[in-house]
Amino acid sequence: MDFCFMIFYNSLSGQKEQFKPIEANKIKMYACGVTVYDDCHIGHARTYIAFDVINRYFKYRGYDVTLVRNITDIDDKIIKRANENGESTTELVERNIKAMHDVFARLNILKPSKEPRATETIPEMVAMIETLIKKGYAYQGANGDVFYRVTKFADYGKLSKQNLEALQQGSRVDVVEEKENPMDFVLWKMAKEGEPAWDSPWGAGRPGWHIECSAMSKKLLGDTFDIHAGGSDLRFPHHENEIAQSEACNECTFANYWLHSGMVKVNAEKMSKSLNNFFTIVEVLEEYHPEVVRYFLASTVYRSEINYSKENLENAKASVERLFNALRDIEPIEVNLPDDASEYEEKFIKAMDNDFNTPEALAVLFSLAKEINTLKTTNKYKASGYAYLLRKLCDVLGILFTDIEEYFKQGDGADASEIEKLIAERTQAKKDKNYARADEIRNQLQQQGIILEDSATGTTWKKG
């Protein structure tokens, strides 16, 4: 495939740019991962589905992708929550990592190439901090904590497009006497009694949040890599601080491209626990199928805000069912691809090559679905070729990953086990020649949107 014309918005430059990897046909990408102090929420799903789609698209375009997505497994929030729960930080972290992996798998998010934990990279963090101190970019305060000296880094604010003076004036950072400047941030924090701690030249303590990502990306991707990704809420101060640390330490560009995913709003309001509109992924999946949730979160351009509402989820559900229905009763066969199928794929690529425009890409999929539905009764051979292409392109977006009939059986309405019981009762009623009861059961299921199909081998069902 042609590698020349992919463009996307680079938060660092503030404009769309043609993508040029450091090494031909290879991409090194880092995505800030979850701080595992609590269950993952719908905002996490938005971010990691957005970057999963991008990762899948890079691979579809032929790139060899190394995606590093870290786990922050030591943090003030983790210590606080573990103390509140009366458990160790290890117990809390391990439980939440497992829960994260479980919900990400349900949403069909691919595993990253590498998934480092912050606690596995402590020596590299210490080494970076030592280098920053030697170069004059860091200092130790009176209480033992080590801070980054932001005034030393001339480019501070280049990602968030703010100069240091403006940041200082608008700063809500708590005044800490040990800091030379209110904007200085912690690199190494001295441990209090009973807290997890690691040895360092400055005393037992733990790393600051920002240095964790700088050290993990350096260790696994090198001093300079292609793409750094994360939620737009991390742009400042986290990503700004990563740049300051890494570029001061390594004396080279940190990441060439920065991708930031848009935030989730709930009924047009900011999602927050205080507004009682905060939803975990598990809570959302109790009401909607993973296919619907993934489609909904992937259907908006990755860097735009997305509005979480029942209406939008119901629309996503209808869209998923339209695509699944197109693939019903037709076997996708690659060798049956029509000559003009390439036109659909080219339109799909054109959409995704332009800043990963998933709404336009999905429009292509619905055009394909319409073509398949038209051809089902007139040219099944051609329809099966188009069905193969639809499946292929859906896989690039990570949608339609469930077996078709299983999806419809898991939809709203009667429980699958209850349906099977009623079908068994209906089968017995027919054997007993109690046709009135058999018809009654069929009608009962039909009212719940369940269609029965009788054959010589038995009765199957699907959601209509």
Swiss-Prot record:
Location(s) in or outside the cell: Cytoplasm
Entry keyword set: Aminoacyl-tRNA synthetase, ATP-binding, Cytoplasm, Ligase, Metal-binding, Nucleotide-binding, Protein biosynthesis, Zinc
GO-annotated cellular components: cytosol
Note on cofactor: Binds 1 zinc ion per subunit.
GO MF term list: ATP binding; cysteine-tRNA ligase activity; zinc ion binding
Keyword Ligase in annotation: yes
Chemical reaction(s) catalysed: tRNA(Cys) + L-cysteine + ATP = L-cysteinyl-tRNA(Cys) + AMP + diphosphate
Motif ('HIGH' region): 34-44
GO biological process per UniProt: cysteinyl-tRNA aminoacylation
Cofactor section: Zn(2+)
Keyword Protein biosynthesis: yes
Listed name of the protein: Cysteine--tRNA ligase
